């Protein structure tokens, strides 16, 4: 089982369900932060990037205990955008069942493309209003591709 810290589009619960391939009813989702990082829009794009930023805290969600199949699905989705997992220490925040400020190791998707020009601070609500619907529809099609690739042993 693996812990993942999400900070961008996958904090949209509908998109996360599509990518995991199941309902979030039994998924442990907790508020969390990654210290010394901030999340920004990529300039002139519809997605975010996380960057080192001393003294800042990137807010997001910790997804606890996902299995290998779910991790493979997330990797497929994020890999299409040149993101890779790096293990980091995160801090759980303001959760009912876990102590406040509990440190935890989790994997974080970092983008490898240093050519991206950073835009303004990321805003999930803005993304949901402007791009959420079309992004979810595209994700459904893209995740179907994963199943088709597996069927032909690709």
Where are these regions (language model features)?
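Glycine-aromatic micro-motifs
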Residues: 1-154
């Amino acid at each position: 089982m693996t812990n993942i810290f999400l900070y961008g589009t996958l904090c949209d619960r509908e998109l996360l369900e599509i990518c995991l391939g199941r309902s979030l009813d039994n998924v442990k989702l907790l508020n969390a932060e990654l210290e010394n990082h901030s999340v920004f829009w990529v300039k002139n794009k519809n997605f975010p990037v996380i960057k080192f930023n001393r003294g800042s805290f990137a807010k997001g969600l910790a997804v606890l205990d996902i299995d290998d199949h779910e991790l493979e699905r997330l990797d497929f989705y994020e890999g299409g955008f040149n993101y890779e997992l790096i293990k980091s220490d995160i801090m759980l925040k303001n959760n009912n069942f876990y102590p406040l400020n509990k440190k935890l190791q989790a994997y974080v998707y970092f983008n490898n493309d240093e050519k991206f020009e950073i835009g303004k601070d990321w805003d999930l609500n803005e993304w949901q209003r402007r791009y959420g619907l079309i992004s979810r529809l595209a994700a459904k099609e893209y995740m179907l591709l994963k199943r088709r690739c597996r069927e032909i042993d690709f």
